């Protein structure tokens, strides 16, 4: 018989930098997870994605064992990296802060494809373009 899921914890943690310190430690402690076991496994799995924020979904079972799924970095993080800026615009409709090309958008859409509910790459590109516009980025090309 399959183990019964007791809790699901969703976090966004910098790749390879999970520590027992807040906010990771308290969130995992409340769920009853072995914090050191999770941090070691997460850091090992995400070591190749250094510098990115990685969303993770942790399933905690009734016997306090756990497993987790790492997702692709958020579209906003990938867009900021592609544009070379720290953050988006506070007034995206009037104040444009950066420009991304269609090629960059396509590359981000292909990266995010497994986590998006898009039928094809073109639909995923439209989603990423919408995120870019809402951050005050101009899409060229």
From Swiss-Prot:
GO terms for biological process: translation. One of its GO terms (cellular component) is cytosolic large ribosomal subunit. SUPFAM superfamilies: Ribosomal L11/L12e N-terminal domain (SSF54747), Ribosomal protein L11, C-terminal domain (SSF46906). Signal peptide: none annotated. Gene3D superfamilies: Ribosomal protein L11, C-terminal domain, Ribosomal protein L11/L12, N-terminal domain. One or more lysine residues are methylated. One of its GO terms (molecular function) is structural constituent of ribosome. It holds the Pfam family Ribosomal_L11_N. PROSITE patterns: RIBOSOMAL_L11. It comes from the Bacteria. Keywords: Methylation, Ribonucleoprotein, Ribosomal protein, RNA-binding, rRNA-binding. Part of the ribosomal stalk of the 50S ribosomal subunit. Interacts with L10 and the large rRNA to form the base of the stalk. L10 forms an elongated spine to which L12 dimers bind in a sequential fashion forming a multimeric L10(L12)X complex. Belongs to the universal ribosomal protein uL11 family. Forms part of the ribosomal stalk which helps the ribosome interact with GTP-bound translation factors. NCBIfam families: L11_bact (TIGR01632). This is Large ribosomal subunit protein uL11. The lineage of its organism: Bacteria, Bacillati, Bacillota, Bacilli, Lactobacillales.
């Amino acid at each position: 018989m399959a183990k019964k899921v007791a809790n699901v914890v969703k976090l966004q943690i910098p790749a390879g930098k999970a520590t027992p310190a807040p906010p990771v430690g308290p969130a995992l402690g409340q769920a009853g997870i072995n914090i050191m076991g999770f941090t070691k496994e997460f850091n090992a799995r995400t070591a190749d994605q250094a510098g990115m924020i990685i969303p993770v979904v942790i399933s905690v079972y009734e016997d306090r064992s756990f497993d987790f799924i790492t997702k692709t970095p958020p579209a906003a993080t990938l867009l900021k990296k592609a544009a070379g800026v720290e953050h988006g615009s506070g007034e995206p409709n009037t104040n444009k802060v950066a420009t991304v090309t269609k090629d960059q958008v396509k590359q981000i859409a292909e990266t995010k494809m497994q986590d998006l509910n898009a039928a094809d790459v073109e639909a995923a590109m439209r989603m990423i373009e919408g995120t870019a516009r809402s951050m005050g980025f101009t899409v060229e090309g």
